[in-house]
Regions:
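Residue-level detector of Asp-centered blade-edge/turn motifs that repeat once per structural unit
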Residues: 5-6, 45-46, 100-101, 146-147, ...
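A flexible loop/linker signature enriched in serine peptidases of the S9 family
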Residues: 8-19, 23-24, 30-39, 48-75, ...
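A short helix->beta-strand "capping" segment at the edge of beta-propeller domains
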Residues: 78-84
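Repeat-solenoid scaffold signature
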Residues: 170-194
């Protein structure tokens, strides 16, 4: 579930499809209507794009639905929308999270790699390669810093698969800083004062 930046809409996945509902009125709109499933919704900063993971043709990808008409302000009352693939075709990708400044989308690629891509398009930037593996939905977590310059995530450093640490990743350089190095599994991180 995701709340739009202006607080006027809530996006959610119900029975595998994306819906958006108004917080002010009793209006709900179905965004997707496919035999495959969707999950993990995230609004853009301006609320005009909705990102989500969707299974299409047997492959998970990050998709977005865009408000195409200038006069449309909300998904619940939009006259037209357009769905498009955001991640690379043929690469398993899911769990999109839009940065607070609206410039980036972070997501998991191939179940092992944390990547970012600019919302305007362009190349995908790998931030954390292949050490982690996502066995089930939501078992890999990451969060944007309030200034959109860093990501916090759990990762496997020197301790192997049974010892996760908390990493601070600088998006611009890709520098990974292990914040915990405790010798024990660490998790449940949060940004403070954001």
């Amino acid at each position: 579930m995701a709340v739009s930046p202006d607080g006027k809409e809530i996006a959610m996945v119900i029975r595998g499809d994306v819906f958006v509902t108004s917080t002010e009125y009793k209006t709900t709109r179905r965004i997707t209507n496919t035999p495959e499933q969707e999950r993990g919704v995230s609004f853009s900063k301006d609320g005009r794009e909705l990102y989500y993971a969707a299974e299409r043709g047997g492959c998970w990808g990050v998709w977005r639905t865009v408000l195409t008409e200038k006069n449309d302000k909300l998904f619940t009352y939009a006259t037209r929308t357009r769905e498009e693939l955001f991640s690379e075709p043929g690469r398993t990708s899911f769990q999109p999270i839009v940065s607070p400044d609206g410039k980036w989308v972070a997501y998991l690629r191939d179940r092992t790699e944390l990547v970012v891509r600019a919302t305007k398009g362009g190349d995908v930037k790998s931030l954390l390669r292949g050490a982690n593996y996502s066995y089930q939905d939501g078992d890999q977590s990451f969060a944007w810093s309030p200034d959109s310059e860093y990501l916090l995530t759990e990762y496997q450093a020197d301790g192997g698969w049974n010892n996760t640490d908390i990493a601070l990743i600088e998006v611009s350089s890709g520098k990974v800083t292990d914040l915990t190095e405790s010798g024990y599994s660490d998790g449940s991180f949060r940004w403070a004062l954001g």
